[in-house]
Amino acid sequence: MMNFLRRRLSDSSFIANLPNGYMTDLQRPEPQQPPPPPPPGPGAASASAAPPTASPGPERRPPPASAPAPQPAPTPSVGSSFFSSLSQAVKQTAASAGLVDAPAPAPAAARKAKVLLVVDEPHADWAKCFRGKKVLGDYDIKVEQAEFSELNLVAHADGTYAVDMQVLRNGTKVVRSFRPDFVLIRQHAFGMAENEDFRHLIIGMQYAGLPSINSLESIYNFCDKPWVFAQLVAIYKTLGGEKFPLIEQTYYPNHKEMLTLPTFPVVVKIGHAHSGMGKVKVENHYDFQDIASVVALTQTYATAEPFIDSKYDIRVQKIGNNYKAYMRTSISGNWKTNTGSAMLEQIAMSDRYKLWVDTCSEMFGGLDICAVKAVHGKDGKDYIFEVMDCSMPLIGEHQVEDRQLITELVISKMNQLLSRTPALSPQRPLTTQQPQSGTLKDPDSSKTPPQRPPPQGGPGQPQGMQPPGKVLPPRRLPPGPSLPPSSSSSSSSSSSAPQRPGGPTTHGDAPSSSSSLAEAQPPLAAPPQKPQPHPQLNKSQSLTNAFSFSESSFFRSSANEDEAKAETIRSLRKSFASLFSD
């Protein structure tokens, strides 16, 4: 019999022919059957039959009743267990056939951490600096630190992106993907010394719309020192040589124009390099021609500026609103103060230095972290020759303080930018079944379409709410004197109005309505004259309400199809009644 039912119910045409909202109450919890009252003894019967009057004396007081013996738990009948297994078979068969919307997955937990990507060398532990910090109120900061050489990424035009990072696990390099919310760049994105060209990663971050310090646009512009020097030339023309003493410089796009210079010695800088690399001091015209031949092999640009016999170098840095000035003096006598031995000390911050760094911090839309480098010559004059961005190295005795300043600056920028740019979550379909109709389901449960019939066994619906051609199966009401039979007249709808608070019946309030009806029944003091419905009848009734289909599903059809469906249901009910009746 079960195999027959499984084959019958696995047929997609069987469930597809069910009318809208027909199988609903199988998902409701089964009402607990009250335990049968214990058989009253003759003394208890006479006591219950006597009116509750005051006892005139202690001799007429009834003896205390002994505690009733615990009654055994009611054993489920064979029909009840059979219908339970049949209900499970119906659910499994319909779910495997794809006729029921898959339950929506539980929503993912809200992200309680923002991912910060720090591009820096491994000697700086930025995770320690951000430990315990929070952004946007209650979001932790998860730090992912790597060098440019360990990173890769993919970005899409819709704003989705993913960053791949190589990490060492048990001595083996593996790739791990994550999605950063903010980027702090503390490493040069381009350098010709070791073919370190990571501008494609900067482009990818800009493509993904990642906020960063400094801005990705400024970082890309700093990948060519002559381009940055052109901005210094514009500042020099605006402020003048007294306020902004910029060194003289000549730019050569290639070696062809490197013929001669009027004065020597000069410093030739080839290409874009850092830490003094690619810089050559040229004493005469012959050495300059030799350098021009080297530039021809590099196939890049070069600049030449007069050599300044310096007493010390000056570095003025700005991190947010914090300013520091340093002086570096060479001890070994090398013309490059960063080569050999040198003495570094912090000096007072003057208004002149502050003007330099404040003016340079406005280039390329604003620099949150920058530094101005200058040379103080033996002639007593200052010469500005370079500006560094957020990739500047930290120097001096206050490196820990500078890292703390950068940490606070990053947190401030994350609170400012991430609040306006929430992270995009990948959109995933919640249901596997697509509705055939073009209408969308109304989230408001009070706006129930008129063609939806009430759940079987629930409170009645006015006649005007029933669709034409819909044949409703007979309703079985629980026994009770307070529940009048349902009819199609207007008096029936008005009499059932007090039992239907809150408008039309929906799936959400069907269990509460049935429970309120059950509470309205008075308890039976005497043995009932009408037998209670058999559990099998309740089960057969609930079998037709196994699933809850939405208004936008595929069960809408014309009146003729509704009549055919109703005829199928009537024949099905007759089959169940003949199969499972006693």
UniProtKB/Swiss-Prot annotation:
Query: Which residues get modified to Phosphoserine?
Result: 10, 425
Q: How is it modified after translation?
A: Phosphorylation at Ser-10 dissociates synapsins from synaptic vesicles. Phosphorylation at Ser-425 by MAPK1/ERK2 and/or MAPK3/ERK1 may play a role in noradrenaline secretion by sympathetic neurons.
Top-level lineage group: Eukaryota
Q: Give the start-end ranges of region H.
A: 458-533
Which residues lie within the region annotated G? 421-457
What are the subcellular locations of this protein? Answer: Synapse
**Ranges for region A:** 1-29
In this chain, the stretch annotated as Disordered covers 16-84, 420-545
Decide whether keyword Phosphoprotein is in the record. Answer: yes
- Listed InterPro entries: ATP_grasp_subdomain_1 (IPR013815), PreATP-grasp_dom_sf (IPR016185), Synapsin (IPR001359), Synapsin_ATP-bd_dom (IPR020898), Synapsin_CS (IPR019735), Synapsin_P_site (IPR019736), Synapsin_pre-ATP-grasp_dom (IPR020897)
Molecular functions (GO terms): ATP binding; identical protein binding
Q: Name one GO cellular component term.
A: synapse
Compositional bias ranges of the Pro residues kind: 31-42, 63-75, 475-484, 524-534
Q: Where is the composition biased (Polar residues)?
A: 420-439
Outline the segment boundaries, as ranges, of region: C.
Answer: 113-420
UniProt modified residues of type Phosphothreonine: 421
Task: Write out the ranges of the annotated region (B).
Answer: 33-112
> One GO BP annotation here?
synaptic vesicle clustering
Stretches of Low complexity bias are at: 43-52, 462-474, 485-523
- Quick one: where is this thing mainly located? other
What disorder is listed for this protein? Schizophrenia: A complex, multifactorial psychotic disorder or group of disorders characterized by disturbances in the form and content of thought (e.g. delusions, hallucinations), in mood (e.g. inappropriate affect), in sense of self and relationship to the external world (e.g. loss of ego boundaries, withdrawal), and in behavior (e.g bizarre or apparently purposeless behavior). Although it affects emotions, it is distinguished from mood disorders in which such disturbances are primary.
| UniProt record similarity statement | Belongs to the synapsin family.
Oligomeric form and interacting partners:
Can form oligomers with SYN1. Interacts with CAPON.
Cite the domain annotation text: The A region binds phospholipids with a preference for negatively charged species.
Indicate what this protein is called per its UniProt record.
Synapsin-2
Q: What is the name of the gene encoding this protein? A: SYN2
